[in-house]
Structure formats: C-alpha cells, structure tokens
Amino acid sequence: VQKIILWANKHSLKVVPSGGRTGLSGGAVAKDKAVVLSLDKLNQIENFNEIDKTVDCGAGVITEALQDFVKEKSYYFPVDFAARGSSQIGGNIATNAGGIKVIRYGNMREWVAGLEVVTGKGEVLNLNNGMIKNNTGYDFRHLFIGSEGTLGIITKAKIKFTTLPKEEQVLLLA
C-alpha cells in the first residue's frame, strides 16, 4: 500500500481505497484521475491473544471471517451487519460502523485496540499498538476511526473480542 501511495503521488494521482463495497453513500467512487486500491488481499488474521482478548486483522478481513475465527476459540466479536459476509474490517473502522448490535456493544471504535495506517504522503503510522492504558498523550487512532479514508488508508488493525454471551434474545421495537 505504501508503494502504491508513493507511486500515485509521483504521478499526481488520487487513490480511493476499496474494501467490501457494501457502503451505499458513494464514498468509494473514483473519479478525476483516481486509482482504486483494493484491500481484498489484506485478509490475514494472526496474533490471537487470549489474555488481552485481541487479534490482528488485515483491512481486507471479512467481518464474518473474524466472527467465525474467534467463535471457533469460544469468543465473540459483536460488531455485526446484514453485510457481514462481504463487509471488511478496514471499511468498518473507516466508517465507525455500528451494526445491528450497536446499542449493546457500541460502534467499531470500541473494538479497535490499535491501527496501522498509510498516510497520503506514504508514511506508515502504528497507532496505539493495542495498549490497554495509554496515557502518553493524544490517541491518534481515534482520528482515523470514522474518517472514511480521508486521513489515510487503514491497512491493519488490532481488534478486541469478548466472551460469548450466555444467551441472546431478539426484541423488535416499532
């Protein structure tokens, strides 16, 4: 990703990150000499940490793949959408998505312990690195969560998970 950003800068081209293409707002539409950068191949899940309850995910990891991965280990990733089979972790973070369980579990921001981001100048930033208590100053990771790719391209995230709920009940309010 960094090399593509540097190349695009050299040729005065814009870069539009593209994830699962589940957004309906048109934010990932490229125009005016723009390069579309697919993040599909950044789909690795690694460094499962049962003590800190975190796992490292590439931006292209499908939401449902992460849910299944932690569920196999008897844990739970609660950020959930109807588009779970195609939405990607990077896009979920870039939009600070909430999903169908947002009232109970919060938005994506609550589940991001660390970020790796490539800025528009090609600089790679490692933000927070999963520290649970970090009182060293500004936590710039929160600037990128919900910024929709305007400040940089999310390439990797340290995602939190939790224990499986004892039971679930669905309630329809109309």
Model regions and ranges:
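Glycine-rich N-terminal segment of FAD-binding domains in flavoprotein oxidoreductases
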Residues: 1-42, 57, 77-79
